[in-house]
Amino acid sequence: MTKLALRALWGRKLRTVLTALAIVLGVATVSGTYVLTDSISSAFDTIFSSIYRGTDAAITGRSAVSKSSTTNLPPFDQSLLGRVRRLPDVAAAIGGVADSSTNLIGSNGKVISFGGAPHLGFSVDPSQPQFNSLSLVTGSWPKSGQVVIDHTTAGKKKIKVGDTIRIEAQGTAIPFRVSGLVKFGTSGLDIGGATLAGFDLATAQKLFRKEGKLDQIRIERKAGVSEAALLAQVRSVLPPQTQVRSGVSQASTDASDTKSFTSFLQDFLLAFGGIALFVGSFVIANSLSITIAQRTREFATLRTIGASRRQILRSVLIESTVMGVLASVVGLFLGLGLAKGLFQLFDSLGFTLPNSGLLLEGRTVVVALVVGILVTVIASLRPALRATRVPPIAAVREGSTLPPGRFARYRAYGSGTLAALGFAALAFGLFGSGLSTTGILVFMGLGALLIFFGVALFSSHLVIPLATVLGAPGAAIGGAAGVLARENAQRNPQRTGSTAAALMIGLALVTLVAMLAQGIRSSFFGAVDQLLTSNYAVTAENNFDPIPVASADPARSVPGVTAVVGVRAGDARIFDATHSVTAIDPGGSKVVKLTWIAGSQSVFETLGATGAFVDKDFAKSNHLQVGSPIPAIVPSGTKQVFTVKGIFKPPPGGSPFGPVTISSATFDRLYTQPQDLFVFINTVGGVTDANTKALDRALAGFPNAKVQTISQFKKNQAAGLDSVLNILYVLLALSVIVSLFGIVNTLVLTVFERTRELGMLRAVGMTRRQVRRMIRYESVITALIGAVIGIALGIVLAVLLIARVDFIVLAWPIGSLVLFALVAVAAGLLAAILPARRAARLNVLEALQYE
Amino acid sequence: MSNVEPNGTVVSARDLTRIYGEGDTAVQALHDVSLDVTGGKLTAVMGPSGSGKSTLMHLLAGLDRPTSGAISIAGQPIADLNDTQLTKLRREHIGFVFQFFNLLPMLTAEENVLLPLTIAGEKPDEQWFAALLEKTGLTDRRKHRPSELSGGQQQRVAIARALVSKPTVVFADEPTGNLDSRTSGEILELMRDSVDSFGQTTVMVTHDARAAAIADRILFLDDGEIVRDLPRSDAKTVIAAMEEIGT
């Protein structure tokens, strides 16, 4: 029987390949995800372990707000370095400063940037090479007024040793002479689009506004000294708000942020692999059902010559297992290619990732194979069971068809119940009270799964009415071919329904994403329109990095400027939790209009040294009223009590302010290196070309500070959302492609099945052209049925979700929805190419005799 | 495997009635038919379209169940057998030859012939298998696939497949119905030969007088009843009998 199963597969190569492709893509996504994330993790591991080369212990600042914080740690006094060097167990120690917004300015006057990656600046100390994780490619290490930059950036931007380059960190852009080009470590590690700029310590301190301060001290111990002893000794001289860790643990602490990023990325991508596999399982089940229906006589013959039901079942399951194995193996290796593609995808969409070569772990192989084979076999169970119900007598009956399943007549109720249960679970997950985050996700996931199953099964009942409507244009313009196409689509509603269902899932998700994105965008736009009364906004070139407070200063002296108001942000420990504290310059009432629950616009101008305004939710959960005290601890450890002066209600789309907002003067006193997230500017006469030019000129010394009109600001702030949206679309396209194979497969099988009928049609005068058109129309009708159900379902899901989530409003991405329907039509046309060609090529005589 | 003595009864049917459908649309395809199939003989069932001859064969072979009446094959009543027991019965006692051959297209001629044994998990008797291929003239064609064989050759493969397990009885359903007349003659010769050389009990349903003429006994069915029962006769007699029934 095994041989028989293998022969059956081999004898139907095209069908097998088309069916298997559905699984190949799903498995490729899973294996590609693992390969991608493993490669990223390993690249980050390499980066962090080489950063702490030769380092036995590292001293850093410590945030008083959050112990686990690894970024924006307060710098400490440089004098510590001398004390550490004098410790008996210390062989060598160097101090350094770093800055994550050290922008290299290109010859076009713009910040050099590759896909959202950081712009790292730091001090280098070539006198202590044991600590140096960089190596020179050409040139020499920097002296005062010089810089070394990474050779990748230099190569891309044609920068040579001896050139002058402007660099903007915490002040105006300053010209530096490029003394050398460096690379990270000694290997060919790609650091993923980050730009590097290294300076001597004094220059770096000045550039980063950390004069007399250090961010880190790295220590090498004397021979024979234990790490524990070294750490204990260092601890004895540590001032408050500093900490020491071993080199290894410092490396893993630094890596923890990227670790959580890669594990998020992994889960995120696996979800799409799961979706593709889910869709693939529909395609497999459907293709196998059709194939098995066509093999009715074969199974019946086997029964008459003594095959038992169990043997038939086994034979079909062996077929699907072998197909699953082959598809999974192919998918596994295709995943390597896909991982490469994903690197490029993320790169082109603005998320460049580090890469040290593709990594295929054993776990990837196991998971990809197990998942691929399991999905195939599970999807084939139902068709296999139906094959066992073929009665032996079907061997002697012509045109024998599969008996309907035992539960066929309950299908409508069953699938309806399934979908209803799904909606109930989803609604419970969304609106039920007292659920944990995991609980919510479990119910939502379960609900979505049930809904998709239910709707997919129910879709066969929608085929006839939908095909009547969707096939009408084809019937009107396509003549007989159009009419026949519509009837063909309707004559096996179950088949058309499950073929369309595969596409339905992909389109439902795409629609859901588009609706949510549109909702987020319009709630954000609504918030900007409601809140901002300024004419201009200034942000970093990449729209999200903070900019030095000094950047906006030159705007103040531009004639006609009536207000320049910066908004800064930092963390503080308030009521035993970490909260964002924002601060605003005087003049806030001129650029922002808040809805006040307590207080009024005048609060902006009367914050003084300790005043604060808070948002409604924060006030409510901490029982605050005007006059309530807010005790806060800032990262440097300083304590400060603020007093509530006003309470405001932010719009659904959010506001520039955190839960607690204070005056910028107070903020600058409490926080080292204050930076602005936004600067809002008002001008006499509003937005005019003259004003724009004047502001651009004034801020020319700060290339990273971008002057935008408020409408540009809106668009730019939403740009990140568009990038995310594009990534989601590309990933969901995978499952749409899988369903496309499903359509191709169904049509090819249908053409086989209708060979004799096609021959008859040709014999009575149908042209090849008309045959092709007929198949094409049927394909488009099937695709459109999937699109209509999918888009409708996506809208329903989105409406439910939006009803639950406060910060998204209901908005209709009409353009996108129309586009999705058009994509479905295109998909239908694409899917029909091969089957239509096969159908048109049939030899009339042979087709008539085909049995 | 033939465990029935020659000239004994291998298949017996009593008062078979088969009604298709219910109520107003009910059709009585077979009406109180009784018969015994003698071992080692070739029995032909003749009759015009709709006479119930195919229904009779389906019932005798256990492919369909009678509305009333009893059947036993090799002495075993089959009315109460479940699917597994019926499968076992088919393996041991029944071979089939079909009008449209029903070969598996992906298997070679040899593999098709051996399939019943493969399914039953048995090893072929090499000598018997060689003799069978020789007899059916397939020795040179054993590695060919059905698509590479002519219709006659395909039916030879099917006959060899039916014989390979030495079943108690072979049921042939219009074995020449899809073949030209010259090839039909060869196939009929082969079937006759299998009865003469191997003592293979065979029941053949046909509407071809020439086919019926090779049988040891010819039953005529009309309107669901046996109307004539002839011993071995030539084609002319058969045709005359057919006309007499007056279809």
Task: Locate predicted features.
Chain A
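Small-residue transmembrane helix packing/gating motifs
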Residues: 51, 136, 141, 184-223, ...
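Peri-transmembrane interface segments
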Residues: 44-47, 240-275, 293, 439-449, ...
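Short beta-strand boundary microenvironments
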Residues: 115-156, 553-558, 562-563, 567-629, ...
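Alpha-helical transmembrane segments, especially those used as permease/efflux helices
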Residues: 11-18, 264-267, 363, 367-380, ...
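Small-residue-rich transmembrane alpha-helices
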Residues: 288, 322-352, 364-389, 418-433, ...
